[in-house]
Amino acid sequence: MERVFTTELQKWQTSPDRKPLVLMGARQVGKTFLLKKFATDNYENSIYLNFDKDRRLGPLLFGESLDPKVLIDKLIIHFKQNIKAGSTLIIFDEVQESPDALNSLKYFHEEANEYHVCAAGSLLGVKLLNTQGFPVGQVNIEYLYPLDFFEFLVAIQETQLLAEIKNITVISPIVEFFHAKLIDLFKIYLITGGMPEAINTYLKTRNLYQVREKQAEILNAYYLDFAKHAPKEQVMKIMQVWESIPSQLVKENKKFIYSVIRQGARANDFEMAIQWLVEADLICKTYNISVPNLPLTAYVNPEIFKLYMFDVGLYGAIAGLDPEIIIHGDELFKEFKGSLTETYVAQVLHKLNAGKIRAGLYYWTSNGRAEVDFVIQHNNKVYPLEVKSGTSSKQRSLAVYADKYNSQLVLRTSPQNLKVTGNLMNIPLYMLGNIRMLLS
């Protein structure tokens, strides 16, 4: 599968300011595959170490010395391969299992930066970011997310359709034939989500029920991660928070309420569990603001927030949503339809925020009178973004927001075509990844 992030790796490879790269992201988003393919396509050879698969590697290679010259000699002997600066990519995978290997990146940067070293790991935010062993300032940190809808189109060989929505030069409706086709494919993406194994299953079988089975396998692997890596006293709480998310989002008021998990539960019972899931890159936390001024972080109410899963396909799987209902619709599906679409939007916006300092997701409320699903910042301006899962054009909350703050432009994302009506821009859900370009 082609990943847009390959471009970032190519920039890293040729950058004069290159540091060792740490690639973070949830488990099974494709970090290992991406780095191995990048090595094959762009280097003469590669050295690959998996510290989870072979627990001896950490003590054996890094136990005595973190001197890069010593480490290079050890790697040459151990793997029986030559290592040439700039021509060999060294990959430390599951690096969270070897703090010494992670710490060695500092010395590669300071003493041997001519060597190209990438480290990848899951749960790095949980295990290592707050420890002394993390080489802050000595590495380039990047994030890999599930495949977005544009990457999905490439995977299913719909590149011509992708060109129709990537190469627009004016804000005008997409040709209706293309729009209808894109909506149909978008519904499939709502089921598959962006996990590579789920999409690969769809490519091989075109069977959405087998996709759900693959997603169940991924979810089961996450439960094993909870038990293996989380503090023992937090494991059950993490599972309870994780499993409560569909119930939280199906409410009319989607804010996270602790008593949904357990009657009488309070914030201090589950704060650590929520933070663990955030740092594991498994959920997106969306904060409430009552005033949409810059910087948005200054107007956050930290006690009021929503939680979205990081992948819309896994959300549908854990909620038990039947693929047939998503494709064809059903009266009983109405309530979940909104939460599924909002989860997709959160996934897109979360990825667009990648690498931004203290970037968060935000939504706006006004004393119970109105609520706008998301508030985004672009070029020092703030825009409200309403999410519609159906074709209804009602936007009372956007109207309240526009009147209150005299907004020149408000945004809606929905299954409707691209258009601007008055001060409202409607962005088709399938085109949301282009939102910054459209605003510019």
Describe every region a protein language model picked out.
Residues 31:
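Conserved lysine of the Walker
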